Amino acid sequence: MLKEVDLAAQTLFAELLQRSLDAEFDAEYRENGSFIRKRSKEREYWHYQWRDGDKIRNKYVGPVSDAAISDRVQRFSSLKASFKRRQTLVRALVAAGLPTPDPLSGRIVEALWKAGFFRLRGVLVGTLAFQAYAGVLGVELGRRPLMTQDADFAQFWGVSENIGDSIEPPLKILRGVDETFRQVPHVSDPFVSTRYRNGQDYLVDFLTPNRGSEDHQGKVVRMRALAGSGAAPLRHLDFLIHEPERSVLLHAGGVPVTIPRAERYAVHKLIVAVDRVNQAKSVKDIEQASILIDVLAVRRPAELAEAWKTAWSTGKEWRRKLESGRARLPGEAQATLKNTVEGSR
């Protein structure tokens, strides 16, 4: 049985999330500049513009339709980031039972955050993202499903191509954390990498959805927002990272991250568990899905049902994998999922 985090800890997490997002915004736009609106393909986006010598610089901020971003634009002059207070909140939340990443994982995600990866609509996926659901959903997640020796980051190719901004090369960012990181040459292109490994075999992967031909599988996609570095195209990833949510990793003073919506993460795990060659990873997929299904059936039943129905309606192959993945769930989780989906009709 899952243990809920007490109400006091949930309140502290909400404060940490707010302060971390404010700190993120404050740190990104320290120059003496101003926010402007730009229109692209019938949508408006915030950009930050400042003078650098005799040049006018411009940085993408986010869509005007995002109420949280627009609110911070309006409050920008009054935002004050308190790192010490955030550290205190992190310590209190860890003491309350919420998970914290191992130090290396925390530093890697923090480095990507500071480099602007999440500002450029990148998404943290995999087990590190799963850790971040504890605070969002207000539950303890146990220990075994939280263990990892890798970090996975994803971004839509279309976003990367058209956002008009870029982080530094991933290898440079990672070597700022651990100088033993090296590129892992890709079999299809030895001059570009999607994976990086350090001296202790910790892996960092960059991924992008494959919504096209099967010919793209196993290849490298160059990502403009990753300074031209590569990402591995994967099926089903577009479903996972569609309309993500924000959370905080409990590292240092809190690291604000963008993660998949929990209901999509759960359904996606049922799909990918079927394709896994590595049995241990497949078991972990099902374990994480089962935990989230139990929580979401109470916290977000309509959203869980909608995520399932969206995946189910995608096509015959998706339905086959969903059925197979669901059958691998513990009996109680199978029943919970079935009742949640049927109850939403």
Model regions: which residues?
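Compositionally biased terminal segments of proteins
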Residues: 1-44, 51-345
